[in-house]
Every structure is written in structure tokens, then in C-alpha cells.
Amino acid sequence: MFQGMIDQVAGEIEHGDGHWRDAVSSMAHSAHDVLRRHPWVPPIWNDHFPGPNRFGHLEWILRTFSDGGFPDELVYHAYHAVEFHIMGFAIQEQQYAQSGMGDDMSEAEIYEMLGKTLPEAEYPHLWTHVRQHMDGDERDEFAFVLDLLLDGLENLRDAG
């Protein structure tokens, strides 16, 4: 039953066309949005044999990198890098939401809770990081890392 449900969710991922980088970026953002709508999927994505939608998704990614001029060995690594970014980010978002520091806590409550175990004088860099989380947009973080990944893959491809 889960296999079919996961495959149905995989079918919601939109696969763009055009230049490889734009297409992969568009697909990754679509997949991220889909997984946010179905937070139960990322932890069990690989627990079940893929169905036709997941196989189609895999084929699309491999073909897009291949058509983008990537050699087979780099296609292999590019696929895993992008998929791990999408899934890893989705799982981390889900776990953060379940940590007790979700949207239902005020910023003051989060600072108070952290202040009890993490004195700012001892952990100044961690506190800077926490404030960036509080003020930032997680969607921007997903895009930032995805762009780094795609830049690196493109550089590897071009270096031959």
C-alpha cells in the first residue's frame, strides 16, 4: 500500500524542460514543495520498491544530466547529490517542525528555552546562527544550497 502511495506522491513532482540547469532547479523546487505537502514521505521514500512514477522521475533526472553534457560517471553522482539534497532538506525540515521549536512557539519562548542550556557568552557563534534561523527564510536556504550544488556539478562537467 505504501509503495503505491509514495509513487502517487512522486507523480506530483513536475519535470521541466529546457536548459539542464533550469530544468533540474525547477524539478528540485517542485519536489521540495511536494514533500512539504506530504511530510510522511521523505523518511520512507527508499523503504519501498519504486513504482512507475519514481522510476520515471529517476529516468528524467539521469536523462537531463546526460543531455546536459555530463559524462555517465558524473551523471551518477549528480543524481545522488540532487536527490540527497532534496530528501535531506525535507527530512531536516520535518524533524525541526517536530522538535518542539516549531511555528507554535514565539521567538521569545525559543530564546528562553535555548538560553537555559546554551549561555550566549559560551556559544556566541551558535547564537548568531540561531538568530539567522529565526530571521531567515528556509526556502532561501534550500535554493542557496541547490545553486551551490549545481555550480559545482557544472564546474566538474566543464573541467572534463
Name the predicted role of every residue range.
Residues 2-10:
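Short, basic, alpha-helical segments at the C-terminal edge of helix-turn-helix-like DNA-binding modules
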Residues 3, 33, 80-87, 128, ...:
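Generic alpha-helical structural context detector
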Residues 26, 56, 60, 77-84, ...:
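Amphipathic alpha-helical interaction segments
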Residues 60-104, 109-112:
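A contiguous pocket-lining binding segment that forms or flanks enzyme active sites
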Residues 95-160:
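C-terminal peripheral helix-coil segments that are non-catalytic and often amphipathic
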